Amino acid sequence: PFRILYMLSDLNYLLMYRVGKYRRKVVRGNLLRSFPEKTDAERLQIERKFYRYLSDYMLEDLKLLHMSAEELCARMTYKNTEQYLELTEKYGGIIVMIPHYANYEWLIGMGSIMKPEDVPVQVYKPLRDKYLDELFKRIRSRFGGYNIPKHSTAREIIKLKRDGKKMVVGLITDQWPSGYDKYWTTFLGQETAFLDGAERIAKMMNFPVFYCELSKK
């Protein structure tokens, strides 16, 4: 039950934040550089909220192993679905740019509101730990998701297109980009590199781009 899940999350928060102090120096340094105008008390409040969010995310993610499609859809509200379904039909696919926020993993339920023959594509970075990598692939494919490792994104999307498949391509776009393909700009007072893969794929495939805004209530 979700009530038990969030009780466990509260315990996990205490262990992670108070006992283990997981990456606390890194988080505090980032908050100080991003919000120098805020007081120590204000930054501390943000810090604690972040760790509570992180703990909830971890437990909610594991819950996906056993949630039904009905349970997932009951806890997710999708907006502008008519528009992206219409453009998927018209162009053969769209790009959805997704942030690391509000349990983005639950977006795997999008497959339930798409046409059965269309493909929800998830581009991911393979994890070094093979067990965790297989676990996350299992979670992300439960509701028809098609997992593509980032190093073969273009090749796999072109193959799907040639096979006559229409698709929604989900990309986590707020990660630090590897290699030389990146765009630099000032973000939260710091020079920050952004991925440009979504733009490249959109231009190559002539896919419209959606920016996904997530919120948690």
Placement of each model-derived feature along the sequence:
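Soluble catalytic domains of membrane acyltransferases
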Residues: 65-217
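Membrane-anchoring hydrophobic helices of lipid-metabolizing enzymes
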Residues: 1-98, 103, 133-138, 144
